[in-house]
A protein has these predicted regions:
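Long, positively charged amphipathic alpha-helical accessory segments at protein N-termini or as interdomain linkers
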Residues: 1-3, 67-69, 75-94, 104-250
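N-terminal lobe of the biotin/lipoate ligase/transferase fold
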Residues: 1-90, 110, 117, 159, ...
Length: 250
């Protein structure tokens, strides 16, 4: 089946667009993009809170009912957001940080949270959630518990949220289509934008253990392949922390 048309469902306020999409999965059409002006309980990966003040950023979740490799859904979501940012601010220096964040230098601009929807027969769909910092002011960015940036902080100007949400919908249609038609091509493009390849980074395991490692490769299933003290190891979960010593500008 071809990728569906992306249709936006606009909400004024919601606890979390991902939660709304999951709770209403059965009645929402494939390709519905749930958008909210604000979230009262925005969520990121590993239970992190996503700062979600009203009218400043993109908060949205895409309903994906056509299933391929679930990991590739994350790749499609990351590439759509990256394409939005690169088209809007070509000199922003944006790249993908494994597994799915979008960074500019050592500062996070967007987080993506993909969650499976399951029933008695198995996985019935995926909800891909997006938080993209657009017009967040520096004083708000300073309150976040990790270095962060917005399009406004990077460029010094404000952006039309409605226009950018429409552009995001276009990019999602493009990459949802690629996800369905050619997952291998999708993965190759996603991997090419992971600028941590070949660099030393700090890998943080789910239990909090931090390791300084050399990134050697990313496997086709999304596992990060790193070298530590001459030994290759593979990780399918955890996070990569970028410090001031980690520079990935183009």
């Amino acid at each position: 089946m071809p990728a569906p048309k992306i249709n936006c469902l606009n909400l004024e306020s919601v606890d979390s667009t991902n939660t709304y999409a999951k709770n209403n999965f059965d009645v929402l059409a494939d390709g519905t993009l749930v958008c909210a002006e604000m979230q009262t309980a925005g969520r990121g990966r590993q239970g992190r809170r996503w700062v979600s003040p009203p009218g400043t950023n993109i908060y949205a979740s895409l309903v994906m009912k056509q299933i391929r490799n679930p990991f590739y859904a994350t790749a499609a979501a990351s590439l759509a957001v990256l394409a939005l940012l690169l088209e809007t601010l070509p000199r922003g220096g944006f790249f993908i940080k494994w597994p799915n964040d979008i960074y500019a230098g050592a500062k996070k601009v967007s987080g993506i949270l993909c969650e499976a929807v399951s029933d008695s027969r198995g996985i019935s769909g995926i909800i891909a959630g997006f938080g993209v910092n657009i017009n967040l002011e520096q004083q708000e960015l300073d309150k976040i518990d990790q270095p962060a940036a917005s399009l406004k902080s990077l460029s010094g100007k404000s952006f039309d949220l409605g226009k950018l949400t429409g552009l995001l919908a276009d990019k999602l249609a493009e990459y949802y289509g690629l996800y369905l038609a050619s997952p291998e091509k999708l993965f190759a493009e996603w991997k090419s934008h992971n600028r941590i390849l070949g660099h030393q980074v700090t890998l943080i395991e789910p239990d909090g253990t931090a390791r300084r490692v050399q990134v050697r490769d990313i496997a086709g299933n999304g596992e990060l392949i790193v070298e530590e003290n001459g030994t290759l190891r593979r990780f399918n979960c955890g996070d990569v922390s970028l410090g001031k010593e980690d520079r990935f500008e183009s």
